[in-house]
Amino acid sequence: MNETYTPPTILLVEEDDEVRPLLSQNLRNQGYHVVVALNEADAIERTKGGSFCPDLILLNQVGRSIQEYAVMGQRICKSAGIGNQTPIIVMAEQYGADMEGKDVQVDDTEYVTYLEDGQQLMNLLHRLCPVYSELSEI
């Protein structure tokens, strides 16, 4: 294979200073290129003018509704000129035991994950945005 492999890029929007470095490192350890944004304005600034096109947008819900975060993901896509095909995942902040461990597909490209553990998130990411080692196994 003569082509240079470029890992998928995840735009991580994470406001929590304690969670941000751990989550971004875990994503890198899984083979992803990670661009970290602190909030929506930072994400828009980083993607403005098509400076880069993430393969997936990952938002950690903090303090606002899941719907507000989904709309935030849509605004980031629109401002970056990213098509509607880019998956958006919102990691839910608070939820009941009945939702724990579930991944809910809201529409064609939007998902809400109610995490039971970190492996659940990685499984969803690998399904929506596989890394090279997974592609070579297909």
Each model region followed by its residue ranges:
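Acidic, metal-coordinating helix/loop segments flanking the phosphotransfer/catalytic sites
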Residues: 36-56
